[in-house]
Amino acid sequence: MILFGSTGSIGVNALKLAALKNIPISALACGDNIALLNEQIARFKPKFVAIKDSKNKHLVKHDRVFIGQEGLEQILTECQDKLLLNAIVGFAGLKSTLKAKELGKNIALANKESLVVAGSFLKGAKFLPVDSEHAALKFLLEGKKNIAKLYITASGGAFYKYKIKDLNQVSLKDALKHPNWNMGAKITIDSATMANKLFEIIEAYHLYDFKEIDALIEPRSLVHAMCEFKNGASTAYFSKADMKLAISDAIFEKQDTPILEAVDFSKMPALKFHPISTKKYPIFKLKNTFLKEPNLGVIINAANEVGVYNFLENKSGFLDIAKCIFKALDHFGVPKISSIEEVFEYDFKTREYLRS
C-alpha cells in the first residue's frame, strides 16, 4: 500500500490496521510531522518517503526522500503497488488522485475534496470509500435496485447543543471539541459548520451516481447511512463511531477480522433523527443548488479552505467561514468548467479574490 497523509488521523489508523494484517507499506508521505514520520519509517520500512518541504529533508531517516507534489507523483509512477490511500487534507490531495487514476491504481479515498471539486474528471477511477458514511452506503447498496432515496447522517458537530445566538462568541478551542469523532482540525471545523456534510453529499453523488441524497442529524453517530426503497422499506447501517471500520473496508481484501465491538441493541439508547437547520448551519442551504450545479464545488471548497484557515489562525470568527463561501459564490456564480486545468484556475482565482 502507498499511504499519503500518514501522520494524520486517517493515516495513523490505517497503519494500525496494516500492522494487524501485515500489509506491506511501500511508501509514506506526510506534511511537517517529521518526528512521527520517522517512527513510522522505523516500523514499516517503506521503500519511498515524501515530505512537503525540502527544508526538512535532512531530518528524515530514509535514503529515498521525495519532495512536494512532484515527489508524490514520482512515487506513484515508480511504486508498483496497486493501492493508494489518499488521506491528504483538502484541495492539495487532488493531483495525487488524478495521477493515481491515470495509472489505474485502486484509490482508497479519504480526500473527499478530489470529488467535490473535480468529480466529473474522475469518472472511471477505481474508488474505495474511506468516509464512514460512504463505506456504509456501499454496503447498503450492494446488489440493490429500486432505490428511492439515500441518507447520510451528521452528529451536528461541536455546536449541536448551542443556540444560534451563541455562535458569535465561540472560540477555536470550542470548535475543535467534536462530541463523537477523533479527527484532524480541518474536518472537525467542517463538521461544526456542516460543510463536511455538504461535501459528503456531493461525494456520494459522484461515487454512486445518484442525486436523491439528504443528510439528517443523528447525535450519537451510531447510524451512518440509510437507504430508502421504492416499496417503502428502508435499511440502515449501524456501527460505533470509529474510522477504523471504514478504513478496513477500503484496504482489506476480506472483511473477516474483528475491528470494533458491535453495537449492543439491547443497551442502545433511543435514537433520534433531526433535519439540519439551515439557520444554524447556513452552508447546508447550498445542498440542492450544489447537486444541480456540481461545478460550484471548486468555488465552495476554495472559499471554505480560506475561511477555515483564517479561523484556525484566529484571523476571523467562526461565522465568517460561511460568509466567506457566500461572498465567493456571489462573485463567481456558476463557473463553466470544461477541463481539469480550469478547476485549478478557479481554485486559484477564488483564493486570490478572498485574500484581496
From Swiss-Prot:
GO biological process entries: isopentenyl diphosphate biosynthetic process, methylerythritol 4-phosphate pathway involved in terpenoid biosynthetic process
Catalysed reactions, as listed in the record = 2-C-methyl-D-erythritol 4-phosphate + NADP(+) = 1-deoxy-D-xylulose 5-phosphate + NADPH + H(+)
Ribonucleoprotein in keyword set:
no
Stated EC number for the protein is 1.1.1.267
List, alphabetically, the Pfam families matched: DXP_redisom_C, DXP_reductoisom, DXPR_C
Positions bound to NADPH: 7-10, 31, 33, 111, 113, 184
Residues spanning the signal sequence: none
A GO MF term: NADPH binding
* Superkingdom field: Bacteria
Report the InterPro entries cross-referenced here.
DXP_reductoisomerase (IPR003821), DXP_reductoisomerase_C (IPR013644), DXP_reductoisomerase_N (IPR013512), DXPR_C (IPR026877), DXPR_C_sf (IPR036169), NAD(P)-bd_dom_sf (IPR036291)
* Residues holding Mn(2+): 131, 133, 200
Q: In which pathway does it act?
A: Isoprenoid biosynthesis; isopentenyl diphosphate biosynthesis via DXP pathway; isopentenyl diphosphate from 1-deoxy-D-xylulose 5-phosphate: step 1/6
Protein residues bound to 1-deoxy-D-xylulose 5-phosphate: 112, 132-133, 155, 178, 191, 196-197, 200
Keywords in alphabetical order:
Isoprene biosynthesis, Manganese, Metal-binding, NADP, Oxidoreductase
Q: Which cofactor does it need?
A: Mg(2+); Mn(2+)
What is its biological role?
A: Catalyzes the NADPH-dependent rearrangement and reduction of 1-deoxy-D-xylulose-5-phosphate (DXP) to 2-C-methyl-D-erythritol 4-phosphate (MEP).
The record's comment on protein family reads: Belongs to the DXR family.
What this protein is called in its record is 1-deoxy-D-xylulose 5-phosphate reductoisomerase
Q: Which organism is it from?
A: Campylobacter jejuni (strain RM1221)
